[in-house]
Each structure stands twice: as structure tokens, then as C-alpha cells.
């Protein structure tokens, strides 16, 4: 039932009792820019500190700048015992024994009101106890270069996940929690954060068919297992290369690309054979952008969007199993079940949002489509406007690489980190400080350790940055929360129970948890502080070329990931189950998308200049891209498809995913559906973001509004940053996100989070320059 931490955001839609905190996985996506009027006034700002400047040397110098302590030796992440792979397996076994003792304590809590009052705290402790090892193991599985460590991490991961699966459907735990929530005195004694945590546990149990008879509960477990297997198969199918298509050399006459295009034509002439072009290859992308003849583009589009019957059947089986699972627990559809604890709440509200967004976006998209039709008309010398087909989009509007809003000097990785640290100091009084890692603390020499330092409270967390590409490391950009915030001084561990010999068995787990606990100034209690890891795959610096120069999309990616990281750092709650990024799926992307908006401000961009010697030019750096609206509209259509596929419709015996997709394209889409295509089998987010694909559009709309209404005029204003931290970031998932947004925007009418609130968000203009393909 539990899923990989690498897709934790996608799993928040089915919050398990013991969820992974995990990481946020984000695929890079094309961004198309729109023209903006940018203020050229650069505000007065705090000078770069020595720590800020040290970040430049840390990340830009290939040798000599790597901070290592020659005198200290420890284990992974500073845990003294984690010095070899066997220690990770041993830690998992110790944690399992300790978790079993705590589980037994919770099960016996009904014997006294004193113990019942501690049930929510103990459930959260149990979740953290298991997740602390599982999330560390998940990071090791995806980043450690040593195969023995990876194998040990797999073993630890599987051992504890098996126990978590038992807890997720444990009727005894459910009954104890029911006893707590049925007691008005106990409920009134819970803090708002504790009560929210209790409700999350309660909903998790109910989604696990906990109150059903044994036969139906077994059916739930069976369906959940089927869904996991089908989901993995679907993702494998989605990434399977499509077969090549045959292209005649004569069809490539007049290619606009004079490099690769000429080489392809010479190859065809030399072999005297048709070219075999694989969809998704560099050659295919070149042809889609450069071939004046429509036929090779059409053939490649058909090949790229083809599916086997088996691939379609796997997807439809997955959708049907999900629908059956939802109906088993008394819900009308999988969307109804999934959206219950989201901002949207119901499928109807998602429809309200998407309909409003469609109404707003359609005029811009149609205008852009008309521009493309005019280009096609001129190209073919036609007397009337032709229809734009799916294979015309890239030829008449070639995708441009993302570019900054104003000309900038080359930005190195270290320079961008310096700018981030300076931005965080302006907004939150928080900065990044390089610190030496001890021998054995990190898993590769590339990894750098940063302290996150608050000007009043000191160290509030740690970021381990593993930023350079290498063999065996997970691809893409990712944010892993290895450890969440949690208050620990009220754990009452002495009450967990014991049996003969258990003291030694649980010692490793106790020592593991004791690391990184701190008493912060001006804050009651002792806290476990957050620890996150950033994984990227940038080019490493070299002696000959110097620091890594980032492309603009890489700068955007880094800002996006650091938005998640600061959410983890500032969302320091007393309960780990609601800390940092552990919030609703349709809210969690807001901080990361908002961070990308800051890159539209010259005042923020000036923070990349440590000495204030560079001059920002007034002239904009890019042209209007008419296809931005088309791409946004296409993403809205995918969100609508996602809702259709998770509605009661899928249980109709005549359900056909291809027919539904084609009908939507022909009735509400911009470009006609192409018979014979079935893109849905490649829409991988249908698994990870099932019934919640709207979330990214939703958070884009909210982030655009927050930027324009709160930050755009003065993005370095400390009062605004403190308001955002106070009203949004510090709560993690412990507060209703609608209340957070309503307070931040001074829009009390949004607080209800009802159908009208969803429609209102749909009417907001998505004013970002952060593209359309979801990072998630």
C-alpha cells in the first residue's frame, strides 16, 4: 500500500497512516516566456556576507574548496553507527522492535485516560520512528554509489514497509483513535496541530477500509496490491520507446536545420534506404521543428503517440481497479475518495476550477492558434486559414529555450546559491552557511553540507547538496526530506514498555533518534530539526573551465527545489506528520512555484552580484511566445482527462480510454484528435497524480496571485516575507490551506474553500513564466 518516497507528493492523495516524508521529484519542463514590463529600479539590499561569498567558492572550485573535517569521523548524516552497510540493516531491525513496543503501548491506551491523552503523540512518534529510517534508506537507494549500501537500504526499506502495511490496516489502532476522538474532553485538550494530526490519521484509516468486515478488508488489500503492480507496469509502458517510423529522404527537402538535417539526408543518399527515425530522438525533434513537408511530421506524430493494445489494457485495468477500490469503501469514484482531504474536496469543485480556467485561457489560446494558422497559410500560399494539426505546433512555433527576463552575465552554480542565501535573508532572516562534513558523513565527495541559519534562533536545519551528474545516481532534480521537524522533549519514552533483553535490541534506534535534537532560543521545548537532500545532475566544475555555468532552466529548477527545501526548514511543527511539505497535494507546489516567480524581478536578480558592480539593463531579453497559451490549454485538457479517467465512467462496460480522450479533444480541445493515437498510455502522471493532476495548474494560479498581490512590487521586503512565513510556511500541513491563502491575500471570501472559491482561483490569470509541463 505504501509507495516509494521518490513520489511522495503523488501519494499525499492517499495519505497513509505512516507515510513517507520522502522527496519531491520534478521533471524539468520547457518554459515559454511572455513579455513583461520589468521595473529597472534595483532596491537597496543587504550586502553579501562572508558566508554568502563562501558558497561561490564551495560550488564553483573543483578542488580545494570541498569542506571536510580531517579530525572528525562519523557515519551517514552524522549518525555515528552508520559507518557500514550492515549497520543500516541492523538499525532497521532495532527500529522494528522499538516500533512494536510502541504499537503495543498504543493498543493498551484504552485502559487509562492518561494514556489515551497521549495516543495522537504516540501515533506521530511511531510514524516518525519508521519514516526516519525508511526515508534515509530511500535516499541511499537513489544516491549512494556503493552497491552494498544500496542493497542494505533496499533490505531496510522493505523490512519496515512491510510492518507499516500492517499498521495501515490495524483495527486495534483504529479503535483506540476512535476512542480518543469520541471523547469530548480529550478532543478539547488537543492543540489545533494535534487535532489536525489526529484527523489525518483517522482519514488514513478510513481510506484503508478499516471498518469493513474481514472479507471486504482482504479485498481492499488485494485491490491495493493489484493497483501497485498495474501502476508500475503502466509507468514502465509509459517510458517504453515507441517503434521507429520510416521517413523518405525526399520528404526532408528544405529542412530548416542545416546541421543534423543535412547529415540525415546524406545518410539516406549513402544507404539508398528510407530513414528509420525513433520518436523522441534528437532527429525526431529536429524534423518536427524543421521539416516544411507535413508528411514526415505527421508520421512521426503518429508513431510517437501510438500504443499497443496491451499498453491500453494495462491503463484501463488500473483505472477500473481504482474505481472498484473506491466503491468498496463507499465512495462514488476514485476521484471522490482521493479529493476528500485536498483543497478541492470534491470532483465537482475541480470541474468548477478547470471550467473557469478554460474560459479564461481559451481566448488567448485561440488567438495563438490563429497566429499559427496564418503562418501555415503563408507557408502554403493558401487563400483561407487552414486547420492546425497536432504535428504543426513545433514547426510553426518552435519551442525556445527558457531565458531570463533581462540580460544577465553567465551564472555559476555557486553564484546562484549565493543569490538564494541573500534572498532568504531578505525575506525570512535566514541564510545558508557552508560547514565541513565529517569523514563518513556523506555518501560521495560531491556532496556539500549547508547549515540553514536563522538570525535569531541559530541553526534550524541542514541541506545536503548532491548536485552533479554521475553514473548510478537517480536522474532529474529531487528534494528528499530525510528528517522532519518534531518536538521530542514530551515523548515519554519510558512508558513504551519493555521485555527482557529489549534494552540492547532497541539501543541503536534510540541512539539514531537522539542525533540532531536541539533547544532553540525563544521556542519552548526540544526539537528534532529538519534535514533535506537536494539531488540534481548539473555538469561538474573543472580546473580548465571553472565553475559550472547554469542554463536558465537549471536556475529555475534550483529555485523551485529550494522553495520546497525552505518549506521543510520553516515548517517546523511539533508533529512530524504535518511538518514542512507534508500537506495537501494541491497545495504543496505553491512555495516552489512561487520561488520561480522571484526570478522575474531585477531586484532579486541583482542578488547574484556579490559586489554590486554589474548593471542590469532595461531591455527585455525575449519575445512574446504565442504558444505559451496553447501549451497551458493543453495541460488543462490533460487535467480534465485525469478527472474523466477517475470518475464513475470507468466502470461502464463500454468504457474506452482512447474514445474518451478523442471526444474531449474534439469537443473542448484546440487541435483535432488524430485517429489512431492514444497518448494516454504515456501520461505517467495518471499513476502518481491520479485524480489530482489539476494540482499543478491550481498552485500555478495561486502562486501567480500571491506574487502579483504580495511580492511583485517589493520582492525583498522583510515584512512581506515574514507575513508569508507566518501565514503559510511555518504551518506545514497543520492548518487549512484555504485559511492560509485567504489570510495571505486578505481575501476572507476564500476561507470557506467551497465551489465558488475554486471558481475564483480558476478565474485568476496564470501569470507565470514557468512553463507548462509539470515538475511535480
Curated annotation (Swiss-Prot):
InterPro entries xrefs: M3A_MIP, MetalloPept_cat_dom_sf, Neurolysin/TOP_dom2, Pept_M3A_M3B, Pept_M3A_M3B_dom
Reaction catalysis annotation: Release of an N-terminal octapeptide as second stage of processing of some proteins imported into the mitochondrion
Keywords of the record: Hydrolase, Metal-binding, Metalloprotease, Mitochondrion, Protease, Transit peptide, Zinc
Active site per UniProt: 561
SUPFAM superfamilies from the UniProt entry: Metalloproteases ('zincins'), catalytic domain
Enzyme class: hydrolase
Domain of life: Eukaryota
Span of chain positions assigned to the transit peptide in the UniProt entry: 1-38
Name this protein carries in UniProt: Mitochondrial intermediate peptidase
The encoding gene: OCT1
Amino acid at each position: 500500500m505504501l509507495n516509494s518516497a521518490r513520489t511522495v507528493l503523488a501519494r499525499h492523495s492517499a495519505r497513509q497512516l505512516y507515510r513517507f516524508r520522502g522527496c519531491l521529484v520534478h521533471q524539468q519542463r520547457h518554459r515559454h516566456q511572455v513579455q513583461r514590463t520589468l521595473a529597472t529600479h534595483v532596491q537597496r539590499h543587504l550586502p553579501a556576507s562572508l558566508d554568502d561569498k563562501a558558497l561561490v567558492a564551495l560550488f564553483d572550485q573543483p578542488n580545494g574548496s570541498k569542506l571536510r573535517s580531517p579530525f572528525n569521523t562519523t557515519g551517514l548524516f552524522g549518525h555515528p553507527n552508520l559507518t557500514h552497510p550492515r549497520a543500516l540493516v541492523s538499525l532497521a531491525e532495532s527500529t522494528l522492535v522499538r516500533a512494536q513496543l510502541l504499537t503495543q503501548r498504543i493498543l493498551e491506551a484504552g485502559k487509562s485516560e492518561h494514556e489515551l491523552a497521549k495516543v495522537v503523540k504516540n501515533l506521530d512518534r511511531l510514524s516518525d520512528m519508521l519514516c526516519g529510517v525508511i526515508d534515509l534508506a530511500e535516499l541511499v537507494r537513489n544516491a549512494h554509489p556503493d552497491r552494498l549500501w544500496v542493497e542494505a537500504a533496499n533490505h531496510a526499506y522493505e523490512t519496515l514497509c512491510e510492518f507499516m502495511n500492517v499498521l495501515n490496516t490495524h483495527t486495534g489502532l483504529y479503535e483506540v483513535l476512535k476512542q480518543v476522538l469520541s471523547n469530548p474532553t480529550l478532543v478539547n485538550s488537543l492543540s489545533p496541530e494535534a487535532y489536525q494530526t489526529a484527523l489525518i490519521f483517522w482519514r488514513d484509516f478510513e481510506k484503508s477500509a478499516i471498518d469493513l468486515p474481514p472479507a471486504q478488508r482482504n479485498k481492499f488489500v488485494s485491490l491495493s496490491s493489484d493497483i501497485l503492480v498495474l501502476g508500475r507496469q503502466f509507468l514502465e509502458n509509459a517510458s517504453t520507446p515507441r517503434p521507429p517510423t520510416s521517413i523518405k529522404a525526399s520528404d526532408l527537402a528544405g529542412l530548416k536545420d542545416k546541421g543534423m538535417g543535412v547529415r540525415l539526408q546524406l545518410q539516406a543518399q549513402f544507404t539508398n534506404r528510407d530513414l528509420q527515425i525513433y520518436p523522441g530522438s534528437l532527429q525526431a525533434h529536429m524534423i518536427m521543428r524543421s521539416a516544411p513537408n507535413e508528411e514526415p511530421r505527421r508520421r512521426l506524430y503518429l508513431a510517437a503517440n501510438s500504443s499497443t493494445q496491451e499498453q491500453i489494457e494495462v491503463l484501463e485495468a488500473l483505472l477500473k481497479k481504482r474505481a472498484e477500490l473506491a466503491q468498496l469503501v463507499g465512495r462514488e469514484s476514485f476521484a471522490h475518495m482521493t479529493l476528500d482531504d485536498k483543497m478541492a474536496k470534491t470532483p465537482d469543485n475541480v470541474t468548477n476550477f478547470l471550467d473557469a480556467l478554460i474560459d479564461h485561457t481559451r481566448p488567448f489560446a485561440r488567438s495563438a492558434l490563429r497566429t499559427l494558422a496564418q503562418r501555415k497559410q503563408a507557408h502554403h500560399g493558401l487563400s483561407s486559414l487552414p486547420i492546425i494539426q497536432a504535428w504543426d505546433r513545433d514547426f510553426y512555433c518552435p519551442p525556445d529555450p527558457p531565458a531570463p527576463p533581462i540580460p544577465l552575465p553567465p551564472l555559476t552554480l555557486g553564484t546562484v546559491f549565493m543569490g538564494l542565501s541573500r534572498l532568504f535573508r531578505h525575506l525570512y532572516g535566514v541564510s545558508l552557511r557552508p560547514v565541513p562534513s565529517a569523514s563518513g558523513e556523506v555518501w560521495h565527495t560531491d556532496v556539500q553540507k549547508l547549515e540553514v541559519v536563522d538570525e535569531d534562533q541559530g541553526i534550524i536545519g541542514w541541506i545536503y547538496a548532491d548536485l552533479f551528474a554521475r553514473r548510478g545516481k537517480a536522474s532529474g532534480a529531487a528534494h528528499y526530506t530525510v528528517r522532519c521537524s518534531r518536538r521530542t522533549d514530551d515523548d515519554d519514552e519510558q512508558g513504551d514498555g519493555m521485555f527482557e533483553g529489549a534494552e540492547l535490541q532497541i539501543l541503536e534506534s534510540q541512539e539514531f533518534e537522539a542525533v540532531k535534537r536541539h533547544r532553540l532560543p525563544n521556542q519552548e521545548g526540544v526539537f528534532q530539526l529538519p534535514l533535506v537532500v537536494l539531488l540534481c545532475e548539473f555538469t561538474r566544475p573543472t580546473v580548465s573551465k571553472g565553475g559550472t555555468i547554469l542554463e536558465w532552466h537549471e536556475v529555475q529548477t534550483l529555485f523551485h527545489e529550494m522553495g520546497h527545501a525552505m518549506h521543510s526548514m520553516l515548517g517546523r511543527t511539533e508533529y512530524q506528520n504535518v511538518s514542512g511539505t507534508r500537506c495537501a497535494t494541491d497545495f504543496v507546489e505553491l512555495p516552489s512555484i512561487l520561488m520561480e516567480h522571484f526570478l522575474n524581478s531585477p531586484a532579486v536578480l541583482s542578488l547574484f552580484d556579490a559586489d554590486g558592480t554589474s548593471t542590469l539593463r532595461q531591455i527585455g531579453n525575449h519575445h512574446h511566445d504565442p504558444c505559451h497559451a496553447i501549451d497551458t490549454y493543453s495541460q488543462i485538457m490533460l487535467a480534465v482527462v485525469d478527472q474523466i479517467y477517475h470518475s464513475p465512467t470507468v466502470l461502464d462496460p463500454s468504457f474506452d480510454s482512447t474514445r474518451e480522450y478523442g471526444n474531449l479533444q474534439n469537443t473542448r480541445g484546440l487541435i483535432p484528435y488524430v485517429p489512431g493515437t492514444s497518448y494516454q498510455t504515456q501520461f505517467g502522471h495518471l499513476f502518481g497524480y491520479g485524480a489530482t493532476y489539476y494540482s499543478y495548474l491550481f498552485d500555478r494560479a495561486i502562486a501567480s496571485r500571491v506574487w502579483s498581490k504580495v511580492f511583485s512590487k517589493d520582492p525583498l521586503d522583510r515584512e512581506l516575507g515574514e507575513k508569508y512565513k507566518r501565514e503559510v510556511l511555518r504551518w506545514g500541513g497543520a492548518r487549512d490551506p484555504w485559511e492560509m491563502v485567504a489570510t495571505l491575500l486578505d481575501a476572507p471570501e476564500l476561507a470557506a474553500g467551497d465551489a465558488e472559491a475554486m471558481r475564483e482561483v480558476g478565474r485568476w490569470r496564470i501569470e507565470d513564466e514557468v512553463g507548462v509541463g509539470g515538475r511535480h
